[in-house]
Regions:
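Exposed loop/turn and edge beta-strand positions of beta-sandwich/beta-sheet ligand-binding modules
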Residues: 14, 38, 90
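A short beta-turn/loop motif at secondary-structure boundaries
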Residues: 10, 36, 84-86
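Residues that recognize and position ribonucleotide moieties
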Residues: 12, 42, 116
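Unchanged
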Residues: 49-73, 78-142
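Acidic, metal-coordinating catalytic segment for phosphate/diphosphate chemistry
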Residues: 1-17
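Conserved Nudix-box catalytic region and its N-terminal flanking loop in Nudix hydrolases
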Residues: 26-69, 147-152
Length: 152
C-alpha cells in the first residue's frame, strides 16, 4: 500500500531484528554495524519496515540484505518498545528467530560491515537493546523446544 500518509498522532518507526541460531543452539549470527548509531558494534541483523510490507516480510528482507541468508521460516518472539531503545528516535522492534547451519553461505551486505557466528557463552557487547532481545529469543526457543503435543 503506497501513498501519502497523514496522521493526527506521531508514529514510531517499526523495525524487525532477527536471531539466527545454529541448530545445536551454541552460536548466534551477528553483524558488525557499518553505520551510526553504534557503528562498529555487533548487533542482530535487522532494519526498518517499509510501508508496503508485513513485519515478517521485513524480517526476511533484512536478513537477506544483511547476511545473504534466504529464510523460509522465522518465528516471531515479540515486540520491544522501550522509549529510548534507539538514539535516532522512537522505534519499536519485533524480534524473530530462525536456524541455519554453520555451513550456510553468509556474507556481510548492505549496511553490515562484517558478519560472524558468535558463541552464546562468549557474546560481545551488542548495540541497542539487543542483549535483552536475544535473551527473550533464547527463552522462546527453549520454551518451544519443550512443547509437547497431546495426541489424546
Amino acid at each position: 500500500m503506497k501513498g501519502t500518509y497523514t496522521y493526527e498522532y506521531p508514529r514510531p518507526a517499526v523495525t524487525a531484528d532477527i536471531a539466527i541460531f545454529t541448530p545445536d543452539m551454541s552460536e548466534v549470527l551477528l553483524i558488525r554495524r557499518g553505520n551510526e548509531p553504534y557503528k562498529d558494534c555487533w548487533a542482530l541483523p535487522g532494519g526498518f519496515m517499509d510501508m508496503d510490507e508485513t513485519l515478517e516480510q521485513c524480517a526476511i528482507r533484512e536478513l537477506k540484505e544483511e547476511t545473504n541468508i534466504a529464510a523460509d521460516c522465522l518465528w516471531e518472539v515479540g515486540a520491544f518498545s522501550k522509549v529510548d531503545r534507539d538514539p535516532r528516535g522512537r522505534t519499536i522492534t519485533v524480534a524473530y528467530y530462525g536456524f541455519a547451519d554453520r555451513a550456510t553461505s553468509i556474507k556481510a551486505l548492505d549496511d553490515a560491515a562484517d558478519i560472524a557466528w558468535h558463541k552464546l557463552s562468549e557474546l560481545p557487547p551488542l548495540a541497542f537493546d539487543h542483549h535483552e532481545v536475544l535473551e527473550k529469543e533464547l527463552e522462546k526457543v527453549k520454551c518451544n523446544k519443550n512443547l509437547t503435543v497431546n495426541s489424546k
